[in-house]
């Protein structure tokens, strides 16, 4: 039906007869001559319809609407000098139409314009409801092609490194791995349920036991959790596992993988090696295990300086086992007024959103004099002032913002404020479209964190991470005592403040695996019922193994310069886990429920029947 793509025509095609197919992007009537911008996935080209050269084509062109599907025959010619368009790849040429065939018309009004000239003005709800139309837009088309290029680049690298792609089951059993499972009732096995996999974690470990040695998969995963801009109920991860490799070898190989992807997709040579930081240092210096290292404003712990001062908010926090930390905002004196920092202000509100009661502040003036409001200034000795200035490195014009309270809340609040101010003050661009790629390995995570509400330990990553041998007693009878404080041989790759992927070395000893499951509160009988197959596999000569999984949706979001993974997925869900286009999820017939041996207990809170 066509000889060329619309966006492929160049000066070397001049005088060629071509056939093009595509959609009408725009139509312009210039007093007897009609111009059509014809668009397909390759781009857009200008069609000139002159009644003297094609009366029938002109008659068709007079009544065309945007998004009408056309086949156009004509001759490529150079555009006259005054009509050259350097914003288009095809801007040096146009096609003189000799024939136009309408392949399909648009019936009724379009829900929104598709043309690149109008695409930024459409509400996301409309875009998702009519996703098939939204996908015609250049931005979405480019994103999906970039996604395909990313996956292809990963496959090429991994296959060159001896990995093989293996599919793992989508229907499996529910296990306590972390997030809530999506579960499906079994019709054949009444009263029993499948679960959709949150990750292929156990299956890829079993593949290592099976001697596969190097596995990868572009895996679909499912988690029934609260959503946000970079989460979906169903998502894709590049899943990798390998045997007979230590942590250093795994990190190096995955650095090479990332570098090959960035080179193939962006044409960028990333600097290596990627920096590394321990989890403890990340939390102390940035308040998060996903630090954005493109800018400064690191957190400074000043608890020891203010622990005895008369300002009870500070001294009380330290005495109760918490912390006082601050961030130094360069140029903050001029950029941030008191109104913005005090209650009701935007900066104050960011701290509150993270659970903090608020912020305290000090302004560093010329001559390194400090200025504050009320009790802070009045209760700081000259020695404490100098210690604060020395430790924070604050210069004149710097604003010091303080958080005080339990350490976790202080970290969370100052991390949020830090990220907010970096965008507000232009330290990073407000969107992800930038040329800064600050990769960072975060290593030495704790194995566990204590859940005070449930009075038990929880695995920080998952209960299959191997502990650091330095932190584990060689006497197995001591494991119950030494495991809670152990570091995991786990690692996350962070890019510009977002977790790009994470993994660990795995436990390959069944006795240690049982002890870890007991540490997270799983009784031996339940552990055997849930994970007996894994324990049996570890007992038949499981090799040392480890791996990593990258979030494909998030990786493509960063590569594409988007703010939401929804713009990198063909048919995403909303933050309410709904597909607005198909109206999923939806109800099912009573007969289907009967066949599945399931009854619904749902009561509509509105009081209306479904």
UniProtKB/Swiss-Prot annotation:
GO cellular component: a single term: cytoplasm
EC number: 6.1.1.23
GO MF assignments: aspartate-tRNA ligase activity; aspartate-tRNA(Asn) ligase activity; ATP binding; nucleic acid binding
Region: Aspartate, residue numbers: 201-204
UniProt catalytic activity: tRNA(Asx) + L-aspartate + ATP = L-aspartyl-tRNA(Asx) + AMP + diphosphate
BP terms from Gene Ontology: aspartyl-tRNA aminoacylation
Protein name from the UniProt record: Aspartate--tRNA(Asp/Asn) ligase
Species this chain originates from: Parasynechococcus marenigrum (strain WH8102)
Record gene name: aspS
């Amino acid at each position: 039906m066509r000889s060329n793509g619309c966006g492929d025509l160049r000066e070397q095609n001049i005088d060629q007869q071509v056939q093009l197919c595509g959609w009408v992007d725009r139509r312009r009537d210039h007093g007897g001559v009609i111009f059509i911008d014809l668009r397909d996935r390759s781009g857009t080209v200008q069609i000139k319809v002159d009644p003297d050269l094609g009366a029938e084509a002109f008659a068709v062109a007079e009544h065309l609407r945007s998004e009408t599907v056309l086949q156009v025959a004509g001759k490529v010619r150079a555009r006259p000098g005054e009509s050259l368009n350097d914003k288009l790849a095809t801007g040096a040429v146009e096609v003189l139409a000799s024939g136009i065939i309408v392949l399909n018309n648009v019936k009724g009004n379009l829900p929104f314009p598709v043309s690149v000239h109008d695409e930024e003005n459409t509400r996301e709800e409309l875009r998702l409801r009519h996703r098939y139309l939204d996908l015609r837009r250049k931005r979405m088309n480019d994103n999906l092609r970039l996604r395909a290029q990313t996956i292809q680049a990963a496959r090429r690298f991994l296959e060159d490194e001896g990995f093989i792609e293996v599919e793992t089951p989508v229907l499996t059993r529910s296990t306590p791995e972390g997030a809530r499972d999506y579960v499906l009732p079994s019709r054949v096995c009444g009263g029993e349920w499948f679960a959709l996999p949150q990750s292929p974690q156990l299956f890829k470990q079993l593949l290592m036991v099976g001697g596969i040695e190097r596995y990868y998969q572009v895996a679909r995963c499912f988690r029934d959790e609260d959503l946000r801009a970079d989460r979906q109920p169903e998502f894709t991860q590049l899943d990798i596992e390998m045997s007979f490799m230590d942590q250093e070898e795994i990190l190096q190989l995955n650095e090479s993988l990332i570098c090959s992807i960035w080179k193939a997709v962006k044409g960028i040579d990333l600097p290596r090696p990627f920096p590394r930081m321990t989890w403890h240092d990340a939390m102390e210096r940035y308040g998060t295990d996903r630090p954005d290292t493109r800018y400064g404003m690191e957190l400074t712990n000043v608890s020891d300086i203010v622990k005895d001062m008369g300002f009870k908010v500070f001294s009380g926090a330290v005495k109760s086992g918490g912390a006082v930390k601050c961030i130094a905002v360069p140029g903050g004196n001029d950029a941030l007024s008191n109104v913005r920092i005090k209650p009701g202000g935007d900066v104050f509100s960011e701290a509150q959103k993270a659970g903090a009661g608020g912020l305290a502040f000090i302004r560093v003036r010329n001559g390194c004099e400090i200025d504050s409001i009320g009790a802070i200034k009045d209760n700081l000795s000259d020695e404490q002032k100098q210690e604060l200035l020395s430790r924070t490195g604050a210069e004149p014009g710097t604003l010091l913002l303080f958080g005080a309270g339990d350490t976790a809340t202080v970290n969370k609040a100052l991390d949020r404020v830090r990220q907010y101010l970096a965008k507000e003050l232009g330290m990073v661009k407000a969107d992800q479209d930038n040329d800064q790629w600050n990769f960072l390995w975060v290593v030495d995570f704790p194995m566990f964190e204590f859940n005070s509400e449930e009075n038990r330990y929880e695995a920080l990553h998952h209960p299959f991470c191997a502990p650091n041998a330095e932190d584990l007693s060689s006497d197995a009878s001591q494991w119950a005592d030494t495991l809670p404080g152990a570091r995991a041989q786990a690692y996350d790759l962070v890019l510009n403040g977002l977790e790009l992927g994470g993994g660990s070395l795995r436990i390959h000893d069944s006795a240690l695996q049982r002890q870890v499951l007991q540490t997270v509160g799983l009784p031996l009988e339940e552990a055997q019922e849930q994970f007996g197959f894994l324990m049996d596999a570890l007992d038949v000569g499981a090799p040392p193994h480890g791996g990593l999984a990258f979030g494909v949706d998030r990786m493509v979001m960063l590569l594409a310069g988007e703010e939401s993974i929804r713009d990198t997925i063909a048919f995403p869900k909303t933050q309410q886990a709904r597909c607005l286009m198909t109206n999923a999820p939806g109800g099912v017939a009573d007969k289907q429920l009967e066949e599945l041996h399931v009854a619904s207990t749902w009561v509509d809170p509105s009081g209306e029947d479904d």
